[in-house]
Amino acid sequence: MTAASGVRMYSKAQAQNSQEQLIQRYAPLVKRIAYHLLGRLPASVQVEDLMQAGMIGLLEAAKKYDAGKGASFETYAGIRIRGAMLDEVRKGDWAPRSVHRNTRMVTDAIRAIEARTGRDAKDHEVAAELQLSLEDYYGILSDTQGSRLYSFDDLLQDGEHGLPEDTSLSHNEPIHGLLDERFQAALADAIAKLPERERLVLALYYDEELNLKEIGEVLGVSESRVSQLHSQCAARLRARLADWRSA
């Protein structure tokens, strides 16, 4: 064995030991994030799959962490772990094309109504625009709630037409570029102009990270009604940010 090969073997062994220590130390963090997310995800998602993806996110965090940027490793790792888990869940999005089509129909209807009236589209107006009964409209909202509501990125996607790459809110690097700043401002403005109850649903779901059942208890409505409110809120934001989404 040459000296160079000996150094390489030593370095490899050190890296492996460091990796194992990292996993042992932060495995509880991965587990905690996995179980926290599980309550907000479809029943088909297995916690073991989340934890496996989270471990990959943890290792990626270890490779890319830069202490000079100010965040603690645990904070940075938490973001990467959660992102890796959500990426894994997104891979399993097998919602029928009809669901994505209905999502776009609702978005287009809301946009048309609000362009005509200059105010928030009401439930019965959207149903009438789609030539549906109110009950059938609520059924569509319940169907479209399912697969992609884990982050603001997902909130603004309809399954086939998402955000422009440069405006992705799941980007883990610092906000960059004028386009991104303008989009963030447009999103903040669109959220501020939502009906009060829809704003509250957003805050409880994304900021407080409550699940739909818990939000229903706060609002005094059923879980299915919260699902409808969330889907309608998502469609309203997609309608108001349509120019950004088609950029």
UniProtKB/Swiss-Prot annotation:
CDD domains: Sigma70_r4. Residues 22-94 are annotated as: Sigma-70 factor domain-2. InterPro entries: RNA_pol_sigma-70_dom, RNA_pol_sigma70, RNA_pol_sigma70_r2, RNA_pol_sigma70_r3, RNA_pol_sigma70_r4, RNA_pol_sigma_FliA_WhiG, RNA_pol_sigma_r2, RNA_pol_sigma_r3/r4-like. It comes from the Bacteria. A motif (Interaction with polymerase core subunit RpoC) lies at residues 49-52. Residues 102-171 are annotated as: Sigma-70 factor domain-3. Residues 212-231 bind DNA. Disulfide bonds: none annotated. Keywords: Cytoplasm, DNA-binding, Sigma factor, Transcription, Transcription regulation. GO terms for cellular component: cytoplasm. PROSITE patterns: SIGMA70_1. GO terms for molecular function: DNA binding; DNA-directed RNA polymerase activity; sigma factor activity. It is found in: Cytoplasm. One of its GO terms (biological process) is regulation of DNA-templated transcription. Residues 190-238 are annotated as: Sigma-70 factor domain-4. Sigma factors are initiation factors that promote the attachment of RNA polymerase to specific initiation sites and are then released. This sigma factor controls the expression of flagella-related genes. Required for the flagellin gene (fliC) expression. Belongs to the sigma-70 factor family. FliA subfamily. This is RNA polymerase sigma factor FliA. The gene is fliA.
